[in-house]
Amino acid sequence: MPKRNDIKKIMIIGSGPIIIGQAAEFDYAGTQACLALKEEGYEVVLVNSNPATIMTDREIADTVYIEPITLEFVSKILRKERPDALLPTLGGQTGLNMAMELSKTGILEELNVELLGTKLSAIDQAEDRELFKELCESINEPLCASDIATTVEEAINIADKIGYPIIVRPAFTMGGTGGGICDTEEELREIVANGLKLSPVTQCLIEESIAGYKEIEYEVMRDSADNAIVVCNMENFDPVGVHTGDSIVFAPSQTLSDNEYQMLRDASLNIIHALKIEGGCNVQLALDPNSYEYRVIEVNPRVSRSSALASKATGYPIAKMSAKIAIGMTLDEIINPVTNKTYAMFEPALDYVVAKIARFPFDKFENGDRHLGTQMKATGEVMAIGRNIEESLLKAVRSLEIGVFHNEMTEAIEADDEKLYEKMVKTQDDRLFYVSEAIRCGIPIEEIADLTKIDIFFLDKLLHIVEIENQLKVNIFEPELLKTAKKNGFSDREIAKLWNVTPEEVRRRRQENKIIPVYKMVDTCAAEFESSTPYFYSTYEWENESKRSDKEKIIVLGSGPIRIGQGVEFDYATVHCVKAIQALGKEAIVINSNPETVSTDFSISDKLYFEPLTFEDVMNVIDLEEPLGVIVQFGGQTAINLAEPLSKAGVKILGTQVEDLDRAEDRDLFEKALQDLDIPQPPGATATNEEEAVANANKIGYPVLIRPSFVLGGRAMEIINNEKDLRDYMNRAVKASPEHPVLVDSYLQGQECEVDAICDGKEVLLPGIMEHIERAGVHSGDSMAVYPPQNLSQAIIDTIVDYTKRLAIGLNCIGMMNIQFVIYEEQVYVIEVNPRASRTVPFLSKVTNIPMAQLATQMILGENLKDLGYEAGLAPTPDMVHVKAPVFSFTKLAKVDSLLGPEMKSTGEAMGSDVTLEKALYKSFEAAKLHMADYGSVLFTVADEDKEETLAFAKDFAEIGYSLVATAGTAAFLKENGLYVREVEKLAGGEDEEGTLVEDIRQGRVQAVVNTMGNTRASLTTATDGFRIRQEAISRGIPLFTSLDTVAAILKVMQSRSFTTKNI
């Protein structure tokens, strides 16, 4: 059926800020969909609240709104734009839930807006547990024994009937939010109570546990003519019980017999036909390893994380095809853009193995609960392609950037037998390393299979890796064995370790023996048809399919997996860098390992190499392509860390030179540069051991800010107030970066602001200054940022501009740099300089309309600001106010403290823009899902040093009409100052929560919590109590404030929205 001509304007809803369970894959899907619809001649209107995305660039849709995805704002936009249709299946759960709300409130009907793609009734059938159960029963597809509970008591009755263990799945939530596996009634009570609160329809599915079954996924497509295909099937390394987003996944499936494959394929197609899905859909199934019994786990009736992985694994662009199906086109009339010959009806065939491994945030959250279950915890993922399981798995392991280059980890090597067994049985993020170590220790794989329920086929592959290791140890420099090791994914570093030589020596011997990788094309058809996709992976075979062109080439290094501190913002900068290179007529080559992002869409760059971002893997591509040089500025710390080794190997680093990157990153060199430039910084020193750190802190004076050098996202950074805490830190956290010293700085609690600057070597452009709402001490990535600044005097602004110019020129910056300042007692100090693109680039690019990454790339390639029409200095400020707000994923991370400090904790960001600060703040809070009720109770439990400041806020809350609740000390202080306060009991370290503030939060008697810990390391009881209070507020979805500056901001909003009532 040809595309529809009765609709002209289509609105797409994006997925909002990045949280665990809903990450960059939706930027990739949304970008693809917008471009596909524009390609077919439709006018596209986009609504998304996340500025850090390519999707929200002006050129992706015809009209872009960066506004909160709430009923209030989306309705307003619908009324203003009057689109003919709405496409909701590309914005993750956020987009789907919004469409449901718009439909149920009658707005779509009122405005005569049609929903495209999968019908709402089908979405309801797939998402509503009861309706889905009825559907599966009607088509004879087996589900787990289950029932729906709307109360805790109902859940207990159902569990008693089915028998423990039980799986709890809240309805209409994403990434397994609020769910879990329960072995006891006590666990069930706790998980169901939380799950009911998080489910928008107050429903939980209580189902039998099939933990231990194989988990298989099918990515399927269907059109309105009922044509349906399987794009890709995938198999989880971990059995059922671990969320698929956290599991290691292989594509295509590896252990299924042909009968099993066909049986599950038929079931997936049966379901998609019955649901009448139009577009992409993900079906998850569980297969009993000992019989042909299977269960349908769930269906995602939309583009998902798995579809992004399937798209990159096969080269088949699922989101693009889904968008075309939504406008009435059928699979047999859409051309496959990979081959440009076959149609979209043609099922992809793979002649390689793809491995995906999740990237977890536990390097930042050492106290986080690492146990993996049905609730997702990964922030990102990596993908690797190889000709066998061993190769793809080991390439994926070294793509993770967790300090390992092989499937071995120091902690696992040092573990005793008891710990090995415990870590194998427990499903944790690092289980692969302990299972591998157990095999090295000689534990039979049959025993491991029995303990872990991991298929013996996968364990046999790990055993094969161990056998190659053992052969390498005793056959040093043997060329045939070296070739075998490389074919199975071994890195030069691992071989060097086994041979006790340097990686350079291994590389030299490889090249001498002509053991070099070839690059194979990802073509969707296992080379059956000729394909022209410039999408490659390395392997050690004969024929090289990546042909070098005659054009001048630039290699751009991506930023690898998404993690806290290095998010989608860096991918945004990478994509814009590529566009600028292409505009200058050069060939842009991207190297990256992240399947979720726009930069790894093969249609973006001239060539894409899906490879780990390690020296060896990058160098192999450079050897083949012989580029003019490499750009490292846009790939975050990942790319910056490769600058030095690449430069030493004779590779030209374009833009700011390696010695100048070093001057910004190395403490002593940076201090000298600041002295030479006459720019003040907070007093500080470096220390290489505990005694040196104590001596330095005593000299500088407490409080001090302490951190390792060369880190991103404030890793292992703390504010320390006394010697005892400092010694504790040095013993606990200093291993964060062993090769580099620890930095000890005077902690100035002033106003913080930051600047992104672009320099051509002579002139410096400052697109804007961002002012942070939270004072120094809260990581810049976790601070709310306001542009243009609202509280800086002209003298301070002039000083910031002057220091920025001096630094950019003094550090020989070519391209981009980011500088963070603190203003303390009217004096401007430089805290740090990052000689690269920072996480604020997308936000500032959007609000100033200056394409910063593209401009910086033009500088790197030799152009200058003046010729491009830009004046040096601070760019003119617009008349709107823009606020960037951090977004956190604490609901997914049990035992992670939400108290904000110098270590970054946010996973994403949202933006609010309006004509006044108050309105922009309101939008940013709404977009970040920090919604304050118009009235209710606010609970204060604050540190002694914060009580004076809290008094003014308490008065303001009372004035608006809020009731005040506080713990004893805070309550007494507020009462003394004439306020009416209801006093609640502290926990005092006890287990009994009855009558305490925690019970108040749990029972919904409190609408907001203000909890500060002050600057001294609190006593264990106070610290534990504070942690439990914060956890309770987060799990109940109650706004929590751990910084008084954020409280001041939200009060500004509430005051601007409330009327004053005074008697005459």
UniProtKB/Swiss-Prot annotation:
SUPFAM superfamilies per the UniProt record, alphabetical: Carbamoyl phosphate synthetase, large subunit connection domain, Glutathione synthetase ATP-binding domain-like, Methylglyoxal synthase-like, PreATP-grasp domain
Catalytically driven reaction(s): hydrogencarbonate + L-glutamine + 2 ATP + H2O = carbamoyl phosphate + L-glutamate + 2 ADP + phosphate + 2 H(+)
Cross-referenced Gene3D superfamilies: 3.40.50.20, ATP-grasp fold, A domain, ATP-grasp fold, B domain, Carbamoyl-phosphate synthetase, large subunit oligomerisation domain, Methylglyoxal synthase-like domain
A cellular-component GO term for this protein: cytoplasm
Binding-site residues for Mn(2+) 4, renumbered to this chain: E832, N834
Binding residues annotated for ATP 2, in chain numbering: R707, S746, L748, E752, G777, V778, H779, S780, Q820, E832
Function description: Large subunit of the glutamine-dependent carbamoyl phosphate synthetase (CPSase). CPSase catalyzes the formation of carbamoyl phosphate from the ammonia moiety of glutamine, carbonate, and phosphate donated by ATP, constituting the first step of 2 biosynthetic pathways, one leading to arginine and/or urea and the other to pyrimidine nucleotides.
Protein name (database record): Carbamoyl phosphate synthase large chain
Organism: Lactococcus lactis subsp. cremoris (strain SK11)
